[in-house]
């Protein structure tokens, strides 16, 4: 049990720590994907606050404007200043700026006190860039995908070599149904933006769902844990297990 604690960071939630048997692994990328309002940003904000409160530096690449001082104030119980001074925020607004943010990230890694890297989300600006690239041809599409692969590789190597945990999020879209499937009443499944590219580099993948206001996390990929579910609710202090009712 001691080895697990050493090789993981706490999630910031007691219930979530129990579900993940100790927290997030240090030497990998952990990926959260799900629709809007499913809790993706809350999972990573909670972990960021927990590390920052330990006086560890957190690099937070915010492409969606999800970083909220008010939310940090709730999570920390009204003492955000100490936490905020330990969070390095980068806010790219287009795909080129996102690529530049990764160069800044690598420079910040010269510090010996980095406890966590967060990207929320890694696919929003990619998705916009990809839409433009498709109008220009296959070579542009390849370029955009190659750039994302380079970013994921940089995160993966950082996690592996420096044992700095990396948490990222991705958006989702409904899969395309054929006319035959649609007429048969088949419901479209949910696909992750970034697909196989993100799956390849991420060693822990957690799907988040929000159905009729009831939120659920599902482990879809993990090195040591089976696929399992965690019903949860978001509260001021963070995340806690939801009861049966």
Predicted segments, located by residue:
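The Walker A/P-loop phosphate-binding site
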Residues: 1-86
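P-loop NTPase motor core
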Residues: 104-197
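Phosphate-binding/switch region of NTP-binding enzymes
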Residues: 157-245
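Short, flexible loop segments at the rims of nucleotide/cofactor-binding pockets, characterized by
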Residues: 7-8, 36-37, 95, 144, ...
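Amphipathic alpha-helical transducer elements in NTP-driven molecular machines
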Residues: 10-13, 17, 26, 69, ...
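Conserved inter-motif catalytic segment of the P-loop NTP-binding fold
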Residues: 56-140
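Signal for well-folded cores of large energy- and translation-related assemblies
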Residues: 20-25, 37, 48-52, 76-77, ...
